[in-house]
Amino acid sequence: MYRKKKLLALLLALAMLLCACGGQPAQEPETPETPEEAPYAFTLEYHRCAPLVEQQIGSDLVAAARQVIDAFLAGETAVMLPEGDYGGNPGNDLGYALNSMCPAFGAVTDYDDNRFDKATRTVTWAYTRTPEQVQEVLTALERTTVDCMSLLRQGDGETARALLLYRALTEQAAYDYDVSGTYDDDPAAYRFHTSSYSALVLHSGICYSFAQALAFLYTQAELDCAAVMGDSETAGLHMWLMAAINGKWYYLDPTWDVGGGWYYFGMTAEDRATWAGEFTGAALLGQDAAQLADLSDTRFSAVNCHWWTDMTIDRQAGQAVFTAAEDEKTVLPLN
C-alpha cells in the first residue's frame, strides 16, 4: 500500500510539472513575413477612380459613376442623379470613367452617350446578357483581378506594381484583328469583345480595350493614370495610357506590347512623337495631355525601345532586372 501511495504521489507531481510547462516542448515563435514576402493587401473596389480622371470629369460625375455601378451590381437599369455639374458631354465622360472603374458594365450593357439625359439627370441602360451571364462576368472579373494583384507584395512601390501589372495584362494577350468584320451586325457582341473586360479576362481586344484594362488595374493598385487618344499618319487613331510612377508621368502602350514585353513602357512624349508611332499629340477627353503633366522624364529609356524576353523583380536588391537573348540585361532601380 505504501508503495502504491508513493507511486501515485510521484505521478501526480509529474502531471503538475507537465501542466506547468504546457506538456509540450517550447516552440519557436513564428517569424512575421517581411514586406518583400507578405501578400499585397488588396480588396476589389469598383468605386475607385484615378485622381487624374476625377480632375478631368469632376467630382459630381465620379459620384454619378459610383451610383451607376451600385445600381448595375444590384441588377437595376436606371439611376436618377442628384443636382450637380454635368456640363460638356457628360454621357461620354461618364462612360469613359466607368470603363476604368468597372469593366463589366461596358461589357454587358448597351450604355452609350445618349443614355445620359441631362434634362432629367437620368442614366439608363439595358443588359445584353442574362442575369446569370452577368454574374459569371462579374465573378470572372473578380477572379482575374485578384490573380493579377496576387503578383504584388506588401512592400512593392509604384515602379514594381506598374511593371508587374503591365506584364500581367500583356503577357498572354493578343490583338483581335477580326473584331470589326466579325461583329459588324451584332453590336452587343462587338461591345463585349472590345471592352476592357475582354482584355482582362479573355486576353483579347483592341487598343481601347487594353488601355482601359491597364487603367483599371493601375487604379485598383492606387496608381494615378488615365487613357489618352492620339492620331498619326503612320499608325492612325490609337489609345494608350499615361500614368504616374514615383511622382513622374509616362506613356505606356499595352496594346503594342501584347504577347509580353516593355518596348513601349515608360515612354516620354518625345518618344511617342518619334520612334513610338509618330503621335505628335495626345488628348484626355479633349484636353491636351502635355498640358496636364510633364511627360519628359527618361527614367525608363534603358528599358523601352528594346525587346526584353523577361523581367524579374529583385525585392531584396531593390531593382528590376530585364534580360534578353545572349545574356543581355539591364538593371532598373525600383526607387
Task: Please describe what each predicted stretch is.
Residues 196-210:
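A short, highly charged nucleic-acid-interacting micro-segment common to nuclease
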Residues 17-20:
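C-terminal motif of bacterial Sec signal peptides marking the signal peptidase cleavage site
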Residues 22-157, 163, 276-335:
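N-terminal accessory/pre-domain segments preceding catalytic cores
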Residues 133-199:
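Secondary-structure boundary elements
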Residues 209-276:
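Hydrophobic/aromatic-rich core segments of domains that either
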Residues 56, 67-68, 202-205, 229-232:
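Alpha-helix capping and helix-loop boundary segments enriched in small/acidic/polar residues
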Residues 1-11:
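Bacterial N-terminal signal peptides that target proteins for export
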